[in-house]
């Protein structure tokens, strides 16, 4: 049986930690930030952990990053 392929778009956007959690960048920061509150902008920095159902889907895209 041939090797499974990793989705190139997923490996660029997500990172699986050593404990199995999936990290992703915060969404909603591309444009329109002038009308956002300072708290929103501050809280949207860095990365966030995906929820369990979303993490399961993303792990399916990256079979060798578990």
UniProtKB/Swiss-Prot annotation:
GO terms for biological process: translation. The keyword Protease does not apply. The keyword Ribonucleoprotein applies. GO terms for cellular component: cytosolic large ribosomal subunit. InterPro entries: Ribosomal_bL35, Ribosomal_bL35-like, Ribosomal_bL35_CS, Ribosomal_bL35_sf. It holds the Pfam family Ribosomal_L35p. Keywords: Ribonucleoprotein, Ribosomal protein. GO terms for molecular function: structural constituent of ribosome. Belongs to the bacterial ribosomal protein bL35 family. NCBIfam families: rpmI_bact. This is Large ribosomal subunit protein bL35. It comes from Ruegeria pomeroyi (strain ATCC 700808 / DSM 15171 / DSS-3).
